[in-house]
Amino acid sequence: WLPNADAVLWFHREVLPLVRGECPEVQFYVVGKNPPLAIQQLAEPETIHVTGFVADVEEYMAQTAVFVIPLRVGGGMKLLQALAMARAVVSTSIGAEGIAVTHGQDILLADNATEFARCVVQLLRDPELRMRLGQNGRKLIETFYSWETATDSLESAYRHAIQPKTR
């Protein structure tokens, strides 16, 4: 998917060198089916891992210190999945579009390479902040995006739609 490839290439080119300047031991995982050749060629032993298809994405997500969503166009379910798993997330505002997140409370948002790298490094160095953001993100999902909440909202909309009109 082009937006994902663009995000990975931008992160690799613009953000990762800045992160490595502060945290040289950092590893970057690109997980997902059918990565284009340009993404596959980023792989470096011990530092950049391009997996291709994996049976269980959550297995990789559970092991991340920081989940990055460097999208510059598009959107998707990655953020909701990461928050549901209580992962600390750094995203562009585009990657978080349409989701009721608050910068510094349940996510860190950054729209340029320098700020994105600063947020990633901050989370890598601060396990308490990672835990707090992860827990707050999980609460956000439970409160606003769980199946129970979604079905309650849908039921309410149906009830309202079929309610007899009064004059």
Positions of predicted regions on the chain:
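A short, well-ordered alpha-helix in the C-terminal region of glycosyltransferases
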Residues: 129-143, 150-156, 160
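Acidic donor-binding loop of glycosyltransferase active sites
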Residues: 47, 53, 62-77, 87-88
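Conserved donor-binding/catalytic loop of nucleotide-activated donor transferases
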Residues: 62-64, 81-94, 102-103
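Conserved catalytic-core segment of nucleotide-activated headgroup transferases in glycan assembly
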Residues: 1-63
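Conserved acidic donor-binding segment of nucleotide-sugar-dependent glycosyltransferases
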Residues: 103, 107-114, 122-127
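A structural motif in glycosyltransferase catalytic domains
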Residues: 8-12, 28, 82, 116, ...
